[in-house]
Amino acid sequence: KPNDVWIGDGHSFKAKVAHPVHGRPFKPEVTVIIDGCTRFVVGFSVSLAESCVAVSDALRIGVKHYGLPIIYYSDNGGGQTGKTIDHEITGITSRLGIRHETGIAGNPQGRGIIERWWKDNLIEMARQYETFTGSGMDSSTKNLMYRKMESAFNALEKGKDLTEEQQKYLKKLP
């Protein structure tokens, strides 16, 4: 029934965006937790990299707005299974009384509900950006985009004026 089982996972966003500190292109980590029954997103976090902090933040949002699930189901990634999450005394799930179950390593089909969510939502969103880097993108186009953006950032760091082409590629970076 609703709110019994939450399913969590993290993925890098499949498009490059401007890093919030230095502005260079990077792919942020998006952590999402959905309700297994309703497929409703109960928590999320956007971070610089996969981490227990990102997972904890997504759990915090879910618990704050929807209460406690009985089971939290995730993969075996470092962000999902670190001591911050799983330690039997100090871990978030044990302190909140949530049973944390993990899938079989290398078997994403076991988390098909959330894997489908990624495909239908986040990957489709990333495809809307010219900086998309996911599967199906032509590798020569991806390499050209990367080289042109690197050229622009290198020129900026050296205090050089940007060419029209460098300016054009910088504008593509969300």
PLM-predicted stretches and their roles:
Residues 6-7, 73, 101-102:
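A structural signal for short, well-ordered beta-strand segments and their strand-loop junctions
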Residues 27, 51-88, 92:
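Acyl-donor binding region in acyl/amide transferases
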Residues 1-32, 40, 53-58, 65:
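Mobile-element integrase/transposase regions
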Residues 20, 46, 82-85:
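Short, solvent-exposed loop/turn segments at secondary-structure boundaries
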Residues 10-12, 34-38, 46-50, 76-78, ...:
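Short, flexible loop/turn elements at secondary-structure junctions
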Residues 36-42, 67, 72:
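Coil-to-beta-strand transition motifs
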Residues 48-55, 114, 118:
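Phosphate/oxyanion-binding active-site loops and adjacent basic polyanion-contact surfaces
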Residues 78, 82, 86-174:
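Globin-like tetrapyrrole-binding proteins
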